[in-house]
Amino acid sequence: SGASFLYAGVTPQTPLYVHTLSVNSYIQSAYRLTKGGSQITDLLIRELQRYGAHLYRQTEVVAFSYGSEQQITAVHTKQGQTFRATHIISAIDVKQLLQIAGKQAFKPSFYKRVQGLQPTASAFSLHLVLKPNIFPYLPYNIYWFKDNDSVYNTAQYATNDFPLSYMLSMNPPKDSREYTDNVTILTYMNANELQRWQNSFTTNTEGNPRGNQYEVFKQQRAMDLLDVVAQQFPTLKSAIAHYYTSTPLTYRDYIGNPTGALYGYKKNANHIMESVFMPQTHIKNLYVTGQSVAMHGLVGVTISAVLTYQILMRSSGFL
């Protein structure tokens, strides 16, 4: 399937349900949002605040306190805050959760299963800001693959054979005109290419720049990707006003998973239960949700959130 980029499919492993849920959401709903997807985040924040929720940005959980019966009584942050609660829901990467909670809090078999999870591929993303009234708006996504073998194996490439695929998309024009002012191009990138910067960390608020060699690497990969895209869209290069890039390290530092994986962990049709997790954990009042324990994407995390909510309400006696 050309749409395998939506879930980083692997030929002998990926279950059919992953393909079905990923593609079906595009068939039954809008595949693009006027004014961008951040509207969903803004709406969720407003609704949460309307119901009295407090949201804390740039707040990293680093430890739990335990009371009787191995229940969590408090959550401690890197910023020095302590939050006390009777129920804890974690949406962070499940491997990171185990680091925070401690190995001793879980059964050895569960801990081993989590540590054995294999991440999906990560990506190199190229975000273009275009000059006005030059590049026509395309009301559809472009999925390009170098050959048939690349459809399910594009994350495995020789260093001099990059990229093997890409997805090209754009936001609808704000003024409803026929030209776009933005293009986003995604391609798989092997995290091993960034091994020399593995110990670095940088976000808008923390860390330090990764240095000139990293910038040169990103620029070279951006040009490699543009050269391939220009074979199909020869006018695109001349329409670029400026651009910025993201690598697997960018995704790692912002999303918080070990490799910057786009879609959580691989699902294996031959061992389907290895990557399936129920919301309950061995810690009585700790629940998990999100793409690292269920399906990825807006559909996947919504299904996971509803399931976690149902389990929490049932265990609390409300259902």
Where do the protein language model's features map onto the residues?
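Active-site-proximal substrate-binding core of FAD-dependent oxidoreductases
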Residues: 66, 314-319
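A glycine-rich dinucleotide-binding beta-alpha-beta segment and adjacent secondary-structure elements
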Residues: 1-11, 227, 231-295
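Mid-domain catalytic core of redox enzymes
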Residues: 32, 62-180
